[in-house]
Curated annotation (Swiss-Prot):
<dbReference type="InterPro" id="IPR056845">
    <property type="entry name" value="LRR_Zer-1"/>
</dbReference>
<dbReference type="GO" id="GO:0031462">
    <property type="term" value="C:Cul2-RING ubiquitin ligase complex"/>
</dbReference>
<keyword id="KW-0812">Transmembrane</keyword>
<protein>
    <recommendedName>
        <fullName>Gastrulation-defective protein 3</fullName>
    </recommendedName>
</protein>
<feature type="transmembrane region" description="Helical">
    <location>
        <begin position="597"/>
        <end position="615"/>
    </location>
</feature>
<dbReference type="Pfam" id="PF25013">
    <property type="entry name" value="LRR_Zer-1"/>
</dbReference>
<dbReference type="InterPro" id="IPR051341">
    <property type="entry name" value="Zyg-11_UBL_adapter"/>
</dbReference>
<dbReference type="InterPro" id="IPR016024">
    <property type="entry name" value="ARM-type_fold"/>
</dbReference>
<keyword id="KW-0472">Membrane</keyword>
<dbReference type="InterPro" id="IPR032675">
    <property type="entry name" value="LRR_dom_sf"/>
</dbReference>
<keyword id="KW-1133">Transmembrane helix</keyword>
<dbReference type="GO" id="GO:0016020">
    <property type="term" value="C:membrane"/>
</dbReference>
Length: 710
């Protein structure tokens, strides 16, 4: 619980800094919280945080910073210089490289000078972790000099860097106290000189081309080495590194973990290694020809032979943040789910698998492979009859699959058939969730479904499937959540257009869904109402009214119009896209029941009152006058509505300012009907009533009736 609250708090602070509204100058965050805030700020701003240098300098106390794939610039250098760092991931050098080009070879970056610019004296004395992976070429002799400014460095990552002939040996001599070294995907021709690293415990050399024993013989001088990674991102049929390792007849006595995925390892070679390495505890062999070990070995084998072993492998790689390996395991799991047999793999935990896959997607958001493969895996799990879930896990599964639908344009699974199947799966899961009878928060379900509806890239069939989900669950979330779901006001126009299409196709249930959504949004978002009033979809809504036949549908549209127009009271609306020619209302005049008549009159009165200079009010005014004698004695206006009109100010505004009979008649009718149900109602508008002067006979008669009630 404490960790969850801490995450929420740090994320809020990051958003406040990003929005420029964090002003708590009296309190300086501790280093742990500062690191978390800075990390979240990087994600929110996509690395472009130089605008917030002052806030960062004033309020944060950074110790551990990792820019990952984000680009650093000179402003970043200035910020980092002010902090005492203990670990640093330097990020992409595209921006900063121009200012630190080597004087002799301007195609290279002088990393030594860049590090001196970033690291103040205190940082140099304390920095124990440095990640400078990337593809930019560094200037000559950087490996020889780096140790002079980083005396206590223990961990170094230089993945992907181009190293010249003697660079590696100089590096080992320059920083002899390293305990962790990652030289993956570098062009190291051999590891001669690694003997200088007497304290090295972890050596990561994925996809390093070492083809003969002489190129890595110095490896066996590392008597304290506990972790060795010689894996390959892609299998090559001619790779022989494990065979050469075994043929050397040498042993790393302290070795605990061997990562050899994608290599030439087989069961025979692995047996020989296990027989000679007494302390070996774990071997990773993904995409290798090994399914299991002999029973007498107690070593744990990481592979993807079964779903159970795959899940353990996934947990391991996620823990060490090995992105490519997480992708590889998820991809392999895709081929295992259709073949799942509970009799052969009865220890597999579907619920735990869902948690780990979702956690993978959350922790490594930048990987499209993890997002795509993860969604496919979850889809397979959701369709499996043997899977059993707790309600919260079920909810998380639904949300993640909805993410998959929304992101289908970015992922590599965006086929129409798959997306339809995915929607059907989501609908089935939601029914299961309903039957669990557990209270759940459906904000995220509504938010993602709403994004699917409003997003142009999502095809019509996908939107059609999102609408009933949105309509069902928008009724179960708070009014504030409804407001934020349509904060960009793109959803309602899309729903209105879909309503029009549903009417044309006579899809009764889609009409109901669309009207329910519009009702909920217009009741809870004043901004959305204002935006809708100004767009052409308002006229489409009136057109829909004219094309509908059911009284209940008429009533829903009238309520939506009332919600929109009521929110515009006292708003300075410069344009309203509503057709004041009320032919669509007049055509069905004879069919009106009392409730529809009330809402029609309310809509007309609000048009007259709110837009005196924008629309032609006379048709609306005439219709109210014409029909008023017939309906004034039968309409019953809800007192709850009347109180809204008082609180909103529309009654006061009409009684004080209006010179149109139509709106005045409506206001007096509201007062009369409400007084008949609640005598105290008139006290709310005594002054306005007494100041109302008019020569209109029909209005004078209404005033007299109200006085008689008093």
């Amino acid at each position: 619980m404490i960790n969850a609250l801490s995450c929420i708090a740090t994320e809020k602070v990051a958003h406040y800094i990003n929005d420029g509204i964090y002003r708590n100058l009296k309190y300086k965050l501790d280093s742990k919280s500062s690191d978390q805030v800075y990390s979240k700020l990087l994600k929110i701003s996509r690395g472009l945080i130089h605008e917030y240098n002052h806030e960062i300098g004033q309020r944060l106390e950074l110790r551990n910073v990792d820019y990952g794939k984000f680009k650093i610039d000179r402003n970043t250098v200035m910020v980092l210089k002010k902090h005492c760092l203990e670990s640093l991931g330097i990020g992409d050098l595209d921006y900063i490289g121009y200012y630190y080009r080597d004087l002799i070879d301007d195609n290279t970056i002088d990393i030594f000078e860049l590090l001196k610019a970033i690291l103040n004296n205190e940082t140099r004395r304390n920095l124990h972790y440095l990640d400078i992976k990337g593809s930019h070429a560094f200037s000559k002799k950087w490996t020889k000099n780096i140790g002079t400014i980083l005396p206590v460095l223990r961990s170094l990552i230089i993945c992907g860097r181009h190293l010249q002939s003697d660079d590696f040996q100089q590096l080992c001599e320059s920083i002899p106290n390293l305990t962790y070294l990652d030289i993956s995907e570098t062009n190291v021709p051999n590891i001669s000189g690694i003997s200088s690293l007497k304290n090295l415990e972890s050596l990561i050399m994925r996809s390093v081309e070492l083809e003969c024993f002489e190129q890595f013989v110095d490896l066996f001088n590392l008597t304290g080495l506990r972790i060795l990674d010689v894996s390959r991102s892609m299998y090559k049929h001619d790779t022989k590194i494990i065979n050469q390792y075994v043929q050397s007849n040498k042993v790393l006595k302290e070795l605990r973990f061997l990562e050899c995925s994608g290599t030439d390892i087989n069961k025979n070679l692995l047996e020989q290694i296990l027989n000679s390495h007494d302390n070996l505890q774990q071997v990773a062999a993904i995409n290798c020809h090994i399914r299991s070990l002999s029973l007498h070995h107690e070593v744990f084998l990481l592979n993807t032979a079964t779903l159970t072993s795959s899940l353990k492998s996934l947990t391991h790689y996620l823990g060490v943040h090995r992105i490519s390996s997480v992708e590889r395991v998820l991809e392999n799991m895709l081929h295992l789910f259709p073949k799942y047999d509970p009799d052969l793999d009865n220890r597999f935990d579907f619920s735990e698998c869902v948690k780990i896959i979702i956690n993978s997607a959350l922790k490594i958001e930048s990987s499209l492979g993890i997002q795509g493969y993860g969604t496919l895996c979850l889809w397979h799990i959701a369709r499996n009859q043997d899977a059993r879930f707790q309600p919260f896990d079920l909810y998380q599964l639904v949300c993640k699959l909805l993410d998959g639908v929304y992101n289908n344009g970015r992922l590599f699974i965006a086929t129409k058939d798959f997306n339809i199947s995915l929607w059907r799966t989501i609908e089935s899961l939601l029914k299961l969730l309903e039957s669990s009878l557990k209270p759940m928060s459906y904000e995220r379900v509504c938010r993602i479904a709403g994004l699917c509806i409003s997003r142009n890239e999502v095809d019509d069939e996908m939107k059609t499937r999102a609408i009933p989900i949105f309509a069902t669950y928008i009724k179960r979330i708070s009014s504030q959540s409804v407001y934020y779901i349509d904060f960009n006001h793109k959803l309602m126009p899309k729903i209105i257009l879909h309503l029009k299409k549903s009417i044309e196709l006579r899809k009764t249930y889609w009409i109901t869904f669309c009207l329910d959504i519009l009702t909920q949004i217009t009741q809870n978002s004043a901004d959305a109402c204002e935006k809708l009033a100004e767009c052409e979809e308002m006229n489409v809504l009136l057109e829909c009214f004219g094309n509908l036949t059911k009284a209940s549908d008429h009533l829903k549209i009238l309520k939506i119009l009332k919600n929109v127009l009521l929110e515009l009271t006292d708003k300075n609306v410069k344009h309203v896209a509503i057709d004041a020619r009320i032919s669509v209302l007049q055509e069905r005049l004879d069919e009106w029941d009392d409730e529809r008549a009330y809402y029609v009159f309310t809509v007309l009165a609000l048009i007259i009152s709110n837009f005196p200079t924008i629309v032609n009010r006379e048709p609306a005014n005439s219709l109210i006058r014409e029909c008023f004698p017939e309906i004034s004695n039968v309409i019953k206006i809800p007192v709850s509505d009347s109180k809204i009109y008082v609180k909103n100010g529309i009654l006061k505004k009409i009684l004080k300012d209006s010179r149109e009979d139509g709106s005045l008649l409506w206001a007096l009718l509201v007062i009369k009907s409400s007084m008949e149900q609640d005598k105290s109602f008139v006290n709310l508008l005594t002054t306005e009533m007494s100041n109302l002067n008019t020569n209109s006979e029909i209005i004078m008669n209404m005033k007299a009736e109200i006085k008689n009630l008093i």
